[in-house]
């Protein structure tokens, strides 16, 4: 098939899954790092309004990025499936079709983010003193959306091939570019939020160039032809997998934007504190996120090869890995959340608001170890419609209503608002366990 390192259908599960997951985790750490650097540098060398602008603007960009990532999951799963089935001849068509689809998507996002940046910022309830800076941040990042979309498509391609190391390399280069850009433009030229946005776009551009260069040099188990670059039958297949995930992620991120708007109404200090907390949350969620991404490729290969029992075992292995690290992260966030917040700003009020939110959010670091591993399993098993349904239940029936109710209370508590996340995740775990047991029963009955 491929070399043994990218063949997940044989060998011990724990080391195979761990070694595949580690570079993905490293890449996610670096992505979170250069997002955090924006906030850290603006917090230290910019204004409080700039800090709020980066906080609110990055929420908008997170929505776009996460939705594109989930849509690209269809590419990852389909490539891994064809490798598991030993039908690599279809992969060129998958890549060519994906290039066309994601280019069209990037063009649409460019129009929305560049020409409607101020409207989006207003809908986000950006504080009046930070509105112009927020719109500028969104507009500049929107101008580089082609790089953001291309990066996520290329990352999905590498993961589908069982190669998680290449992604780590080109993200490392991007992180270095972003740090240098932030220091020069924000600390040096005092461009505040706009400088952070320019640095982010430049970093994404460099990462795409590196990814393309690495892909061209890589020895691939298939050929890509010019005729593959069109809307072909493979587009329907990967969109069938990715669209439910993208819709679910869109509504989930929309709920976090609504949450951001709820918090913004509580004032500039609450808005800035929430922004700092979100950067810490991004780091706290890295291990569950890397498990989910690696699980999809791992499971998809085994399902393609007919190894369903091994696919199930990989899910339980992932849950075990996640729980070990999740408990450690929980303890750190719960006990030292104020210290972590202090890394981003010296403003005592902002630190207090950030820590208040983290106290409510902290149990999420444990709960997602279970949820994300199960979601990764269902993604790889082509049960993305279910993933969408359970995600919508969490978002629309639990997280959003609870966060809104807590935000309109007299002397609204950021801790109680933060608690809406682990509460909705707990509901998601119960739903996924029920579906997993039902699915096993159904498969046993149909195979009997």
Which residue ranges define each predicted feature?
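Hydrophobic transmembrane alpha-helices of multi-pass small-molecule transporters
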Residues: 63-66, 178-183, 207-212, 283-286, ...
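Transmembrane alpha-helix boundary and packing residues in multipass membrane permease domains
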Residues: 24, 28, 40, 77, ...
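Helix-terminus/linker motif at the lipid-water interface of multi-pass membrane proteins
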Residues: 29, 33-52, 121-128, 184-191, ...
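Small-residue-rich hydrophobic transmembrane alpha-helices
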Residues: 51-111, 148-167, 273-337, 368-390
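Short runs within selected transmembrane alpha-helices of multi-pass transporters and secretion channels
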Residues: 72, 141-159, 167-175, 196-209, ...
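Transmembrane helical elements of multi-pass membrane transporters/channels
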Residues: 19-38, 140, 174, 203-207, ...
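N-terminal transmembrane alpha-helices
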Residues: 8-40, 44-45, 59-74, 78, ...
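Short alpha-helical transmembrane segments in multi-pass integral membrane proteins
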Residues: 1-21, 79-146, 188-243, 299-364, ...
């Amino acid at each position: 098939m491929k070399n043994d390192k990218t063949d997940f259908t044989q060998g011990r599960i724990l080391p195979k899954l761990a070694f595949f997951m580690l570079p993905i985790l490293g890449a996610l750490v670096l992505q979170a790092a250069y997002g955090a650097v924006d906030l850290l540098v603006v917090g230290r060398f910019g204004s409080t309004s700039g800090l709020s602008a980066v906080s609110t603007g990055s929420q908008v960009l997170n929505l776009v990025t996460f939705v594109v990532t989930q849509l690209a999951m269809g590419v990852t799963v389909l490539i891994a499936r064809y490798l598991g089935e030993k039908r690599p001849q279809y992969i060129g068509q998958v890549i060519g079709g994906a290039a066309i689809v994601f280019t069209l998507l990037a063009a649409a996002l460019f129009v929305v983010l560049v020409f409607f940046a101020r409207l989006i910022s207003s809908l986000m309830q950006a504080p009046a003193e930070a509105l112009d800076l927020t719109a500028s941040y969104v507009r500049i990042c929107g101008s580089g959306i082609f790089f953001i979309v291309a990066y996520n498509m290329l990352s999905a391609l590498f993961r589908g091939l069982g190669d998680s190391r290449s992604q780590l390399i080109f993200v490392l280069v991007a992180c270095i570019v972003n740090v240098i850009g932030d220091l020069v433009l924000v600390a040096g030229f005092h461009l505040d939020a706009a400088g952070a946005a320019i640095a982010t776009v430049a970093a994404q551009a460099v990462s795409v160039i590196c990814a393309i260069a690495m892909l061209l040099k890589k020895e691939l188990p298939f050929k890509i032809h010019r005729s593959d670059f069109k809307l072909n039958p493979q587009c329907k297949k990967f969109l069938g997998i990715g669209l439910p995930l993208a819709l679910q992620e869109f509504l989930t991120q929309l709920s976090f934007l609504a949450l951001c708007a709820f918090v913004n109404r509580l004032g500039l200090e609450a808005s800035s504190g929430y922004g700092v907390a979100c950067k810490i949350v991004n780091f706290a969620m890295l291990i569950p996120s890397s498990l989910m991404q690696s699980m999809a490729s791992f499971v998809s290969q085994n399902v393609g090869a007919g190894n369903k029992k091994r696919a199930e075992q990989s899910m339980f292995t992932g849950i075990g890995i996640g729980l070990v690290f999740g408990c450690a992260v929980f303890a750190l966030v719960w006990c030292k959340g104020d210290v972590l917040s202090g890394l981003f700003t010296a403003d005592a009020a902002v630190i207090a608001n950030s820590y208040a939110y983290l106290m409510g959010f902290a149990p999420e670091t444990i709960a997602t170890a279970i949820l994300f591993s199960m979601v990764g399993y269902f993604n790889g098993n082509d049960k993305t419609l279910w993933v969408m349904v359970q995600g919508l239940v969490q978002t629309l029936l639990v997280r959003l209503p609870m966060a809104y109710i807590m935000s309109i209370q007299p002397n609204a508590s950021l801790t109680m608002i933060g608690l809406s996340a682990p509460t909705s995740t707990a509901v998601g775990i119960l739903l996924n366990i029920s579906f997993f047991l039902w699915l096993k029963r159904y498969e046993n009955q149909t195979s009997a």
